[in-house]
Amino acid sequence: MPITPTKYAITTRQSANWSDAKRRVFALYRRWLRSTPEMQSMYSLPLPISVIRTRIRQEFERNRFVNKLPVVDVLLTKGHADYQETMNFWRQTTHMMSYFNEESFRGAKRLPSSFIDGFLQGRN
């Protein structure tokens, strides 16, 4: 599978108004959702496509109430950069699984949260 670094590249720009920003956010969201099956096969994720799409939606919902246009533009730029890194296979499976703490093969609680908890569990 040849990698073309500029295949998913998009030039950065500022949104003219809120409707333009909304259109750009929906376009980015659709790009992420449409590429979910390809991401699952590329990274051999042991998760169904519906779980991956739900997690993508949660990431977009986290920034739903941002009310400053320059902040939305920065989030769009970061979203496009993440999409490009993901689709060009510049990440590893552990990077992708870090978004899924509940389903992660590493486990959410690897180390105790405090010294006392670790001491009582017999860990260093």
From Swiss-Prot:
GO cellular component terms listed in the entry, alphabetical order: mitochondrial inner membrane; respiratory chain complex I
Principal location: mitochondrion
InterPro entries the UniProt entry points to: Complex1_LYR_NDUFA6_LYRM6, NADH_Ub_cplx-1_asu_su-6
Domain of life per record: Eukaryota
Membrane topology: Peripheral membrane protein
Subcellular location, record wording: Mitochondrion inner membrane
Keywords tagged on the record: Electron transport, Membrane, Mitochondrion, Mitochondrion inner membrane, Respiratory chain, Transport
Pfam families assigned to the protein according to its UniProt record, in alphabetical order: Complex1_LYR_2
Similarity comment text for this entry: Belongs to the complex I LYR family.
Quaternary context: Complex I is composed of about 40 different subunits. Belongs to the peripheral arm of the complex, most likely the globular part.
Reported function: Accessory subunit of the mitochondrial membrane respiratory chain NADH dehydrogenase (Complex I), that is believed to be not involved in catalysis. Complex I functions in the transfer of electrons from NADH to the respiratory chain. The immediate electron acceptor for the enzyme is believed to be ubiquinone. The precise function of this subunit is unknown but believed to be important.
PANTHER family to which the protein is assigned, alphabetical: NADH DEHYDROGENASE [UBIQUINONE] 1 ALPHA SUBCOMPLEX SUBUNIT 6, NADH-UBIQUINONE OXIDOREDUCTASE B14 SUBUNIT
Protein name per UniProt: NADH-ubiquinone oxidoreductase 14.8 kDa subunit
Gene encoding the protein: nuo14.8
